[in-house]
């Protein structure tokens, strides 16, 4: 993640390069546009990721997992919860380690929202972002959904999508 760090404050806080984040979001929107929405799996085991992930799934048509991931769901066809996505989006590769591992075994590409402390092993595309803050997660999932619709030609450049960032925020969030 070092290449995505803009600077380190005196108190030790890592500041990510927002230009890199923006480039990655645009690229990921184009990548996701190549997949049928129902073949995209979006996962968050972090509580602050639940609402943005569910909103993303609803607005785009992707499958979502916000409860405990059942081991074997990507690798064991005999598992009751077996699914075969073509691409996986993880809110936090550390918290969602089991699905990251299984996606690697099943040769499924992985997009991950990563903060400065995350490792990029088994991650194919990264979005450098704060993956623990509820406002940051709402914004990133909103932007990815918007860029995906742009890449599919469903909205024009400069046009707003048929949903707002508020759809991705938790009810308890204040502006």
What do these predicted ranges mean?
Residues 1-162, 169:
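Ribosome large-subunit tunnel/peptidyl-transferase-proximal elements
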Residues 165-175:
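Charge-patterned, long linear interaction tracts outside catalytic cores
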């Amino acid at each position: 993640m070092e290449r995505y760090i803009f600077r380190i404050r005196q108190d030790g806080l890592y500041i990510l390069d927002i230009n890199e984040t923006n480039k990655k979001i645009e690229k990921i929107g184009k990548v996701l546009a190549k997949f049928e929405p129902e073949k995209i799996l979006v996962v968050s085991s972090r509580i602050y990721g639940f609402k943005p992930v569910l909103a993303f799934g609803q607005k785009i048509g992707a499958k979502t997992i916000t409860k405990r991931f059942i081991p074997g769901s990507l690798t064991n066809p005999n598992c009751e919860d077996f699914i075969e996505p073509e691409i996986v989006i993880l809110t936090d590769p550390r918290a969602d380690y089991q699905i990251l591992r299984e996606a690697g075994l099943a040769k499924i590409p992985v997009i991950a929202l990563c903060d400065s402390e995350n490792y990029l092993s088994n991650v194919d595309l990264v979005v450098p972002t704060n993956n623990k803050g509820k406002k940051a997660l709402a914004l990133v999932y909103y932007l990815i959904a918007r860029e995906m619709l742009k890449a599919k030609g469903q909205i024009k450049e400069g046009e707003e999508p048929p949903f707002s960032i508020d759809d991705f925020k938790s009810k308890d969030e204040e502006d």
